[in-house]
Amino acid sequence: MDTFSTKSLALQAQKKVLSKMASKAMVAVFVDNTSSEVLDELYQATKEFTRSRKEAQRVVKNLVKVAVKLAVLLRADQLDSNELAQLQRFRGRVRSLAMTALSFHQVDFTFDRRVLATGLLECRDLLHQAIGPHLTAKSHGRINHIFSHFANGDFLAALYSPAEPYRSHLCRICDGLGRMLDEGGI
C-alpha cells in the first residue's frame, strides 16, 4: 500500500521552510512585542553567561524554531486529543513556573535553583510527550538543548544574582513575564 500523502508532504515542507527562517524577523511574525522583549533579554543573559554570541543565538534560534513547529502542528490540527491534553499540561506547568520565577524575583532570599531547574526539566519532558511523534530527532535535540541551557543551575544562579548585568536582565525578563501572565500569553 502506498503511504504517500500530499497533506503530510505539505506539512513537512512547511516545517522545513519555517525552520530555516527562524530569524529575528520571523520572531516578529510569530510572537508579540512582550515575548520578543523577553527573548531578547534571555539572549543577552545567555550571551553574558556563555561569553559566546554564537551559543546565545543558537539557544534562542532553537527556541524560536521549536515554537514555530509547534504552531504549525497546532494550526494544521496534527495533534490528537491525548497530545493536546499533554500540551495543556505543558502550558499549565509553564504558567506555574513563570509565577514561581516572578515570586523568586520579587521576594528576597526565596530563590531556589533546584525548583526552577526541576520545573524546566518537567516542561521539557511534557513537551517531548506532547509533540514527540511529530518531530525529527534534530528537533528533539533542539528541545533538549533549550531546556538543558535554561535549567543549568549555574546559569540560574547567575541570573538571580544581585550582580549586574544579570540583575537588569532578570528585572526586564520578569516584567515581561508579568505582562504575559496578565494578558494570558502564558
Curated annotation (Swiss-Prot):
Q: Kindly report the protein's main subcellular placement as a broad class.
A: cytoplasm
Which key words are in the record? Cytoplasm
Q: What InterPro entries does the record tag this protein with?
A: TNFAIP8-like, TNFAIP8_sf
Q: What processes in GO biological process is this protein linked to?
A: negative regulation of TOR signaling; regulation of apoptotic process
Query: GO molecular function of the protein, one example?
Result: identical protein binding
Q: What does the entry list under GO cellular component?
A: cytoplasm
Tissue distribution of the protein: Detected in wide variety tissues, such as neurons in brain, hepatocytes, germ cells of female and male reproductive organs, muscular tissues and variety types of cells of the epithelial origin (at protein level).
- Compartments where found: Cytoplasm
Query: What conditions trigger expression of this protein?
Result: Up-regulated by oxidative stress and by 6-hydroxydopamine (6-OHDA) in dopaminergic neurons.
**Any one Pfam family match given in the protein's UniProt record, by short name:** DUF758
Q: Does the keyword Coiled coil apply?
A: no
User: Which superkingdom does the taxonomy of this entry point to?
Assistant: Eukaryota
Q: What does this protein do?
A: Acts as a negative regulator of mTOR activity.
Quaternary state and partners of this protein?
Interacts with FBXW5; TNFAIP8L1 competes with TSC2 to bind FBXW5 increasing TSC2 stability by preventing its ubiquitination.
PANTHER family associated with the record: TUMOR NECROSIS FACTOR ALPHA-INDUCED PROTEIN 8-LIKE PROTEIN 1 (PTHR12757:SF2), TUMOR NECROSIS FACTOR INDUCED PROTEIN (PTHR12757)
Instruction: Spell out the family assignment given in the record's similarity comment.
Output: Belongs to the TNFAIP8 family.
Which named protein is this? Tumor necrosis factor alpha-induced protein 8-like protein 1
Please give the organism: Mus musculus
State the organism's lineage: Eukaryota, Metazoa, Chordata, Craniata, Vertebrata
